[in-house]
Amino acid sequence: MISLNKLGVTYPNGTEALHNISIELNQGEFTVILGSSGAGKSTLLRCINFLTYPTSGKVIIEGNGDLNHPKILQKHRQRTGMIFQQHQLIPRQTALKNVLVGRLGYHSTLRSLFPLPKTDQYIALNCLERVGLLEKALTPVQALSGGQQQRVGIARALAQKPKFILADEPIASLDPASSHQVLSNLQKICQEDRIGALISLHQVDLALQYAQRIIGLGKGTILFDCNPSEIKKQQLEEIYQTLSYNPISKTI
């Protein structure tokens, strides 16, 4: 379990990105953060892995302790997979080599300069198979579609043998069919391996379809935290009230 205790982020210019965030994220739970652009979703995800350092509050890992301790942070990052909106892949490298990046945290810097052991390659190939891309293992990722590239990103995160996965707008640049495939793959893998997941989205319909739990975020604060079946239309309208379009009208 990951506990966020009164987490806050204020940038040097005085902008408050997150305010007094207190939540618990459970192993095996598929959670979606729902909110409009600028709500603080990406900042919250990055705080959980200390890619952005909170200016107040704590992130506590069950069984390990406070992430402010360097050794605890290193171990946490090793077992926390990240999936990014822009994939963060090496375009000219094959899908297999990109997935092997997920194994580097298990080796010293010197060892990682050489080809990784066959055991790691088997793990990477298995991860590609689980996202339906084994036949693309030796294909440069720049030759893959956007949806396929994001599935390589999932496989790379899975190769870390994570206890938790953080996904920042993983379907933002994908078409509807690819979006469903990526979320379906991710949900299935997390359920099978009891991996906790926190995924930021702005698509209400997809959050309602795939999430076990939805956290509504607006202007850096939590507006609601509940099961999809408990969400009221008024709560969603509060999140999206500043938008010029209405993503809610056909979802509830």
UniProtKB/Swiss-Prot annotation:
Membrane topology field: Peripheral membrane protein
Entry EC no(s): 7.3.2.2
Location (main, coarse): membrane
Subcellular location: Cell inner membrane
InterPro entries the record matches: AAA+_ATPase, ABC_transporter-like_ATP-bd, ABC_transporter-like_CS, ABC_transpr_PhnC, MetN_ABC_transporter-like, P-loop_NTPase
Gene3D superfamilies linked: P-loop containing nucleotide triphosphate hydrolases
Family: Belongs to the ABC transporter superfamily. Phosphonates importer (TC 3.A.1.9.1) family.
Subunit structure, as described in the record: The complex is composed of two ATP-binding proteins (PhnC), two transmembrane proteins (PhnE) and a solute-binding protein (PhnD).
Keyword Cell membrane: yes
Superkingdom of origin organism: Bacteria
Stretches assigned to the ABC transporter domain: 2-244
Catalysed transformations (reactions): phosphonate(out) + ATP + H2O = phosphonate(in) + ADP + phosphate + H(+)
Biological role stated in the UniProt entry: Part of the ABC transporter complex PhnCDE involved in phosphonates import. Responsible for energy coupling to the transport system.
Protein name: Phosphonates import ATP-binding protein PhnC 1
GO-annotated cellular components: plasma membrane
Residues the entry annotates as binding ATP: 35-42
